[in-house]
């Protein structure tokens, strides 16, 4: 299989993963917000902080991967 096709598929997969990750965190934040509105417990605050940490870390890794795949695709296109 052509390496450019593989890299392009990796790029599309990265974008899809970012969309799915964002949707998952948004749904999780909605549940945490509902819990906070009814009862602002220490557990809800902890879950909110944890969700924010997961969000930041996840996006960091996803965007680093996306940038890496994009750079690899550009380098491959210039060599051919």
UniProtKB/Swiss-Prot annotation:
Transmembrane regions listed in the UniProt entry: 5-25, 55-75
Assigned keywords, A-Z: Host membrane, Membrane, Transmembrane, Transmembrane helix
Membrane topology field: Multi-pass membrane protein
Primary localisation category: host cell
GO cellular component, as recorded: host cell membrane; membrane
Transmembrane helix among keywords: yes
Protein known as: Putative transmembrane protein ORF80
Organism: Acidianus two-tailed virus (ATV)
């Amino acid at each position: 299989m052509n390496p450019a096709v593989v890299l392009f598929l990796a790029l599309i997969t990265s974008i899809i993963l970012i969309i799915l990750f964002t949707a998952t965190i948004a749904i999780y934040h909605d549940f945490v917000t509902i819990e906070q509105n009814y009862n602002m417990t220490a557990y809800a605050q902890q879950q909110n902080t944890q969700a924010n940490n997961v969000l930041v870390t996840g996006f960091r890794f996803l965007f680093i991967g996306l940038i890496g795949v994009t750079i690899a695709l550009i380098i491959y296109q210039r060599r051919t």
